[in-house]
Amino acid sequence: MKCMPPPLREILDDVLAGHRLTEEEAVRLLATRDRGVWEIAAAANELRERKVGNVVTYVRNQNINVTNLCVNACGFCGFSRKPGDADAFFYGETAVRGKAREARERGVTEVCTVSGLHPEFDVQSYAEIYSWIRDEVPGVHIHASNPMEVAYAARRSGISTREVMELMRGAGLSTLCGTAAEILVDDVRRVICPDKIDTGSWARIIREAHGLGIRSTATIMYGHCESEADRARHLNILREIQDETHGFTEFVPLSFIHKNTPLYRAGLARAGATGREDLLMFAVARLFLDNFDHIQASWVKVGTKMAEMALLSGADDLGGTLFEESISREAGARDTDYLDPAEMRRMAEDLGRVLRQRTTTYALLPG
């Protein structure tokens, strides 16, 4: 039987012995093809078991996309609309409160809200949304906004990003979404999201949030026009931040949904990641991010079957129930609104594991 080349086998043996992967080693692993993919996945799976055992987790949450109106025009996004577009929408107080009441009736522990950059939003707009949710669902964990929204609110309000997050927290924000990271390489960002904050600004705002005691997720959006070296650089930036702050709750690989995006239609991006790339993203993340406990397999982005395979490749979490999801659907994903915990349990048990409900910050709940 053909085996993995000795130099790559040595990398896996070293990391299983406690060696910290370098960017160069990560690039070599991410570029692996043929049977070597399975060996990398197996090594990642072993590290996952050492770190978190055989529990698969999920969070009972509801997503609320408040508006698709956005001042930016990111090439990877099929969600954003401009004022006057026939399918543009904005949910005001009555609608947001109504959706929050639905969340309460569904017994969620988390409400997640990230939206377009509405032309008229400032920090008070975000604070009002959080306060409406908090009023309707007392005690719920509000996981919301991201560094881009923080920077936008700061610019619109004439205050610092730190002040924005202090005001957001006062209004009910619990943790910050680690989205808007995409690829933390500015040459790539200039192609896929030229109007978004740069890498340094994203990292600075995340560090500020963690310094304020506001924890966040960490993400990568891959499978468009980036290289393996870009992915490795991105992972290294996240690892460096986590070394400093210990503020990331999880890492979430987000596979690029290409179908309805300007970037793909203009020929500037490939048709998303392959299955090999998906598995290696989860596996190499587990091997590289030695200071992260949890890696989420987003069923919205990769589908339930690939999410289950990700659980064999280093991932330990299936994300949320969501109930409502618009951003991935508008980009061309299917069946993105809801995944029943019963189906998550079937996936976990198929692998001989136990499904447990968690909080946003990974405390296990009874039952």
UniProtKB/Swiss-Prot annotation:
InterPro entries: Aldolase_TIM, CofH/MnqC-like_C, CofH_family, F420, FO_synthase_su2, rSAM. It is an enzyme of class 2 (transferase). It catalyses: 5-amino-6-(D-ribitylamino)uracil + L-tyrosine + S-adenosyl-L-methionine = 5-amino-5-(4-hydroxybenzyl)-6-(D-ribitylimino)-5,6-dihydrouracil + 2-iminoacetate + 5'-deoxyadenosine + L-methionine + H(+). Binds 1 [4Fe-4S] cluster. The cluster is coordinated with 3 cysteines and an exchangeable S-adenosyl-L-methionine. Residues 56-290 form the Radical SAM core domain. Pathway: Cofactor biosynthesis; coenzyme F0 biosynthesis. Its cofactor is [4Fe-4S] cluster. Keywords: 4Fe-4S, Iron, Iron-sulfur, Metal-binding, S-adenosyl-L-methionine, Transferase. GO terms for molecular function: 4 iron, 4 sulfur cluster binding; 5-amino-6-(D-ribitylamino)uracil--L-tyrosine 4-hydroxyphenyl transferase activity; 7,8-didemethyl-8-hydroxy-5-deazariboflavin synthase activity; iron ion binding. Its EC number is 2.5.1.147. The keyword Amino-acid biosynthesis does not apply. [4Fe-4S] cluster binds at C70, C74, C77. Pfam families: CofH_C (PF19288), Radical_SAM (PF04055). It comes from the Archaea. Belongs to the radical SAM superfamily. CofH family. PANTHER family: FO SYNTHASE (COFH) (PTHR43076), LIPOYL SYNTHASE 2 (PTHR43076:SF1). Consists of two subunits, CofG and CofH. Catalyzes the radical-mediated synthesis of 5-amino-5-(4-hydroxybenzyl)-6-(D-ribitylimino)-5,6-dihydrouracil from 5-amino-6-(D-ribitylamino)uracil and L-tyrosine. This is 5-amino-6-(D-ribitylamino)uracil--L-tyrosine 4-hydroxyphenyl transferase. It comes from Methanoculleus marisnigri (strain ATCC 35101 / DSM 1498 / JR1). The gene is cofH.
